[in-house]
């Protein structure tokens, strides 16, 4: 009887124990080169002359951060004039005179700016406009470039997608970003923009809750503004519980830039954190998801303080996702975006979206081409796990939605 030739040949071992013969064995990596794990824990704020005597306990107090926020060009000048020349100061003053957003910067952010190279710094570009860098606005620009108000059945509630609503609960933030899509409503009036009023009033909220309760197709709600960091603890509970009590609402998220620009609030505002935790826990018991969405844009925004704050949220079972804005000179280089995504993953923040910069007045110097976004996304894919790789999207002008 003939022997089956396949059975006659012994199978070569799949695993080769001789590591020297494995062609693609990766070399050992110097731990110091894994930069996304090296989060600064120094007293970086003491480089600012005005805060050189501020101790760690004081700096980590969210009330101190709020009290000492930079809220005017004059206050900014007083704080940084020893670090920069008069030409830079004049440039900033010219920038704010032409900007659609009021001035508000937390000490945490201001201290993270590299004041040796402020013109090129990725954090400075997001928060401090320079007159010398402002470019002519895009010809298709409108103040509400995404058409949010056109899809608002009641003031401050946008219902664009079939099963999702955007609830703008208030119109203030702990900082004001240059690139804010809602510069038509957020913050104080400026020389350039008279704002739409979206105050946190009972009457306006009631109209929004009534609409959402009557639209049975709604399952997903984004609570934004403004910024949910500015909600009081009882407001967090009220909004959360009223949404949880609507049977067809299955999930919602509080949107806040807070963890990126004032992470110490999570560590020291116990009432706010407890209120958020209560809503998340109640939602989980009902089979509903409540999450926190935040907005880190540059690796330098992620510090040891960020890690401590996100660690507290992680321990409490609160999911945190990140939505970045793709900006020229901030995060439009592949290496920067890889570093950002890995740092976020390292502190248990899920990189979720990267938005191509919207049409916003006074920010053409920050906008990139869509093609540049495609290039960076291609480089980012494969650099880390797929579930830690953000999706790049364009929110089309005029109300077209995400693409």
Model-derived regions: residue spans:
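Iron-sulfur (Fe-S) cluster-binding segments and ferredoxin-like electron-carrier domains
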Residues: 180-193
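C-terminal accessory regions of radical SAM enzymes
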Residues: 375-403
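Short cysteine/histidine-rich metal-coordination sites, predominantly Zn2+-binding motifs
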Residues: 193-201
């Amino acid at each position: 009887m003939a022997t089956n030739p396949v059975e006659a040949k012994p199978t070569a071992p799949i695993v080769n124990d001789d590591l020297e013969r494995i062609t693609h064995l990766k070399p050992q990596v110097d731990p110091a080169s894994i930069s996304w794990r090296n989060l600064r824990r120094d007293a970086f704020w003491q480089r600012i002359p005005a805060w050189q005597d501020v101790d760690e306990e004081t700096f980590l107090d969210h009330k101190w951060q709020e009290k000492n926020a930079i809220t005017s060009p004059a206050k900014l000048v007083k704080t940084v004039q020893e670090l920069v020349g008069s030409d830079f100061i004049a440039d900033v003053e010219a920038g704010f005179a032409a900007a659609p957003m009021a001035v508000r910067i937390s000490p945490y952010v201001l201290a993270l700016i590299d004041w040796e190279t402020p013109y090129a710094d990725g954090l400075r570009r997001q928060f401090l406009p320079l007159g010398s860098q402002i470019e002519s606005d895009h010809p298709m620009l409108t103040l509400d470039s995404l058409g949010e108000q056109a899809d608002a059945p009641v003031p401050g509630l946008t219902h664009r997608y079939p099963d999702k609503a955007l609830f703008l609960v208030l119109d203030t933030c702990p900082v004001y970003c240059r690139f804010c899509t809602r510069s038509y409503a957020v913050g104080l009036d400026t020389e350039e923009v008279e704002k739409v009023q979206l105050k946190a009033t009972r009457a306006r909220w009631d109209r929004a809750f009534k609409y959402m309760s009557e639209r049975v197709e709604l399952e997903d709600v984004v609570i934004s503004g403004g910024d949910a960091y500015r909600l009081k603890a009882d407001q967090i509970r009220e909004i959360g519980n009223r949404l949880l009590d609507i049977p067809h609402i299955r999930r919602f998220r509080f949107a806040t830039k807070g963890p990126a620009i004032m992470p110490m609030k999570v560590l020291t505002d116990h009432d706010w954190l407890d209120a958020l935790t209560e809503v998340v826990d109640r939602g989980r018991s009902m089979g509903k998801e409540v999450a926190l969405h935040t907005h880190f844009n540059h690796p330098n925004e992620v510090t040891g303080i960020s890690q401590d704050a996100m660690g507290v949220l992680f321990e409490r079972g609160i999911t945190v996702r990140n939505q970045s804005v793709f900006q020229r000179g901030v995060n439009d280089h592949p290496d920067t975006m890889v570093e950002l995504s890995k740092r976020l993953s390292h502190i248990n923040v899920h990189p979720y979206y990267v938005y191509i910069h919207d049409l916003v007045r006074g920010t053409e110097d920050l906008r990139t081409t869509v093609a540049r976004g495609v290039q960076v996304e291609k480089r980012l894919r494969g650099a880390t796990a797929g579930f830690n790789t953000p999706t790049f999207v364009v929110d089309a002008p005029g109300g077209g939605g995400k693409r």
